[in-house]
Amino acid sequence: MIPSAYPDAKEMARLTARMLLEIHAVHFNAKDPFTLSSGLPSPTYIDCRKLISFPRIRATLMDFLTVTVMRDVGFEAFDNIAGGETAGIPFAALVAERMALPMTYVRKKPKGYGRNARIEGAMGEGERVLLVEDLTTDGGSKLSFVDAIRETGATCGHTAVIFYYDIFPETTKTLGDHGVALHSLCTWWDVLAEAKQQGVFDEATLSEVEKFLHNPRKWQEANKK
C-alpha cells in the first residue's frame, strides 16, 4: 500500500539517518579505520542489509523510497522492479509490492546462455525497469546491473537506493554518462548531521569523519597502513 501523505525530501533524509543510527547500521571508527573493497581505509561503514530485520523501520523506509521514486519520476513510469544480487533483492521485492509491479533480480554473473542469462524472473522487451539497490558509493557497480537489464531489450534509466555516499564527485557523472538517474533517501552528510544532533559519537570521531567526507581521497592517502 502506498501512503497518501509523507514528509518532504529533507525530513525523509533526516528520519532515514535517524533510523539507520537507531539500528546501529552506521559505524564510525577513526582510530582503527575499516578497509573498503578497494583496499583503501575509511572511518565510516554502513550496513543497510540490517534493515530487513527491523520490520517497522523497514516498512517506513520502503514507503519513503517508493514515494521518492514516484515524486521524482512518476506514478506510471515503470513496468518492472529489479534488484541487484544480493543486497538489492529484498528491497526490490518490497518496492515492487508497494508499486503493484512485477519483480525480478539481476545476477552478478550469468547463469546459462542468452541475453537473459543474468535475469531471474520475467523481464520483457521494451519494459521500463527500475533498479533498486541498498546503497551506492561511486555508482560504478550499478552499471553492470543496468547493462544486464538492457541486454534483455528492456530499458533502465533510473536506480533507487536507500543510501548514497555523496562524497565522490564523479558519481552522478558516471551514472549520467550511462543514461541513469540516481534517487536516494539519505547521504553521509545527513547521517553526520543526525549523529551530531544525537551525540552518539564523540567529538574527535565526528571531526575525523567530517574531514574524510570533505576530502576522502586525501584522508585515505594520509591513513594508509
From Swiss-Prot:
Name of one Pfam family that matches: Pribosyltran
Catalytic activity: orotidine 5'-phosphate + diphosphate = orotate + 5-phospho-alpha-D-ribose 1-diphosphate
Entry EC number(s): 2.4.2.10
Binding-site list for orotate: 137
Sites where the protein binds 5-phospho-alpha-D-ribose 1-diphosphate: 107-108, 111, 133-141
Function (record text): Catalyzes the transfer of a ribosyl phosphate group from 5-phosphoribose 1-diphosphate to orotate, leading to the formation of orotidine monophosphate (OMP).
Identification of the protein by name: Orotate phosphoribosyltransferase
Lineage: Bacteria, Pseudomonadati, Pseudomonadota, Alphaproteobacteria, Rhodobacterales
